A protein has these predicted regions:
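Flexible, Gly/Pro-enriched loop and linker segments at secondary-structure and domain junctions
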Residues: 2, 42-44, 98-109, 176-232, ...
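Generic detection of short hydrophobic beta-strand segments and adjacent strand-loop junctions
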Residues: 7-13, 229-233, 306-311
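Helical lid/core segments from catalytic subdomains that handle acyl or acyl-like groups
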Residues: 239, 302-401
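Non-catalytic N-terminal regions of enzymes
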Residues: 1-170, 253-254, 258-266, 399-472
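Extended charged low-complexity segments that act as oligomerization/scaffolding linkers
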Residues: 157-158, 277-321
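Non-catalytic, low-complexity flexible loops and terminal extensions
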Residues: 14, 77-81, 124-128, 136-243, ...
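Hydrophobic "lid/gating" helix adjacent to the active-site nucleophile
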Residues: 30-48, 238-293, 348-351, 435
């Protein structure tokens, strides 16, 4: 369904640009943080189900140590490619599929001695958890305790307060609602019955219809290949965006979500009447307290938006030309404010993002239950949707040596991307956003190779940027 998650960070040394992330420095930093993150020593494996004959259940195991040589890679890319950003490199590693029964499913890729790509399977952690690990590496690089060692062995311990973590689903502030689950199921069927395909986004994607079967001997040949495109926003543009969003009582996430929907409705799907989209939300601050300081278990849910498209198309027509300096941007900002209010209302009052999360408990525990229970539901509700996730701005000034001294190392750029989903079974375009405070922000968008045209995705990003520049 989806290969992996990548968090990429650019590290810079304030003392001298010539100091790079050498093998000795990276290994020493990992040996400092290893005891904090036993997730990096986690493997999974399948065994016959304990309750259903002929089915399989996945189990986790924790290794006491691993060899970093198996997980840390040092590569060099041409200067011309590096100058364009890490998109091509990230795309290559999005097409890396791990075998978690052999070793823990993660790699740390050091690019040109300046960039770290943390590539990992979803069971290790979510996007926010990935930033915790790269931030901890930054702390380790700035730690006075750091010592260069010759060993490539990384040791773990499970003797950590609050580990293993209680399932975050059990810590959610709202109970399972069977009624809500049934209502959502009926809602999506009603959409499919009431609307023709041309009235929905992504009705023209190319879908390879596959039979989902745990024992499918061809499954290796059918693994998703990710295509990745990027929109890079410099510090000046982001500053203008943030100030404009504040003055209009909304957020950058809601503005971007609105611009995506406006662009698709006005420029690419002029006959579309209705759209369902999802905004990924980090719910850590809403969970019941846990002994562990930072939740590493997946703690991301979604807030669904159900929108009639004529108002978005109207907003798109108003902002369709850079040369038209007299357009009325009020409708764009109104839609962005409504989206922000909708997300906040859901998380603080309606809490459907929590009850939907709980619905996972309705599934069985076997691999086959996932195939027969979860995936068909995902296909029903997501196949005409896009998804947006924003990790926000990383604040490197918070990651300094614990002794209060000036930090030698800092992070100057942060990027986030999750691999494409299988077309027809989940969101067709997946937007992932991250940046650094007072620095650049990168919007990555991915999709399955062959499902959409490269020109289509490039054009979507170009028009989003055109409208963004016009309204800020």
């Amino acid at each position: 369904m989806q290969a992996n998650v990548i968090i990429a960070a650019t590290y810079a040394n304030a003392k001298a640009e010539s100091i790079v992330l050498s093998k000795e420095l990276v290994y020493a930093a990992l040996q400092l943080i290893g005891p904090q993150y036993p997730e990096l020593g986690t493997t999974t494996f399948c065994r016959p189900s304990e309750t259903k004959s002929g089915q399989h259940r996945r189990w986790s195991a924790f290794l006491r140590e691993i060899n970093m040589d198996d997980h840390v890679k040092f590569i060099n890319i041409p200067a011309e490619e590096e100058a364009k950003g890490l998109t091509a490199t990230m795309e290559r590693y999005h097409n890396l599929w791990f075998e978690p029964s052999v070793r823990p499913a993660w790699q740390l890729v050091v690019v040109n001695g300046r960039h770290l790509l943390f590539v990992y399977d979803h069971y290790i952690t979510d996007g926010r958890g990935g930033t915790y690990i790269l931030e901890s590496i930054l702390d380790a690089l700035n730690s006075p305790k750091q010592e260069l060692v010759n060993s490539s062995i990384l040791e773990f311990t499970t003797e950590i307060k609050g580990f293993p973590e209680e399932d975050p689903i059990k810590r959610a502030p709202a109970p399972l609602s069977l009624f809500q689950a049934i209502l959502n199921y009926l809602r999506f069927w009603a959409i499919l019955l009431l609307y023709r395909q041309k009235h929905l986004f992504f009705h023209d994607v190319v879908i390879k219809d596959l039979k989902l079967d745990y024992k499918n001997p061809q499954k290796e040949a059918n693994l998703v290949r990710t295509r990745l495109h990027s929109l890079r926003l410099d510090a000046s543009t982001m500053k203008k965006c943030v100030l404009a969003c504040r003055s209009h009582q909304t957020t950058f996430t809601s503005l971007l979500h609105t611009l995506i929907k406006v662009t698709l409705a006005a420029d690419f799907y002029p006959q579309a009447k209705f759209n369902h989209s999802t905004t990924v939300v980090d719910i850590r601050s809403y969970l019941k307290p846990n002994d562990r300081e930072k939740t590493m278990e997946t703690a991301a849910s979604i807030v669904s938006s159900w929108d009639w498209l004529p108002q978005f198309r109207k907003a798109g027509e108003q902002t369709a030309s850079e040369d038209n300096a007299t357009f009325d941007a009020n409708l764009v900002w109104e839609l962005a404010r409504k989206h922000r209010a909708h997300v906040l209302n859901d998380m603080n009052h309606r809490k459907t993002c929590f009850t939907a999360w709980h619905s996972v408990d309705l599934l069985g525990q076997d691999e086959e239950d996932y195939i027969t229970g979860f995936i068909p539901g995902l296909k029903l509700c997501q196949r005409n949707a896009f998804s947006l996730s924003n990790l926000g701005a990383f604040r490197p000034n918070q990651s300094v040596g614990q002794d209060g001294r000036n930090a030698d190392w800092t992070i100057t750029s942060l990027e986030f991307s999750a691999g494409a989903y299988k077309t027809g079974y989940a969101a067709n375009l997946v937007f992932n956003v991250a940046g650094v405070q007072d620095g650049p922000t990168t919007v990555h968008v991915c999709y399955e190779e062959g499902a959409l045209g490269d020109d289509f995705v490039d054009s979507v990003l170009e028009r989003i940027k055109m409208r963004m520049d016009a309204i800020i």
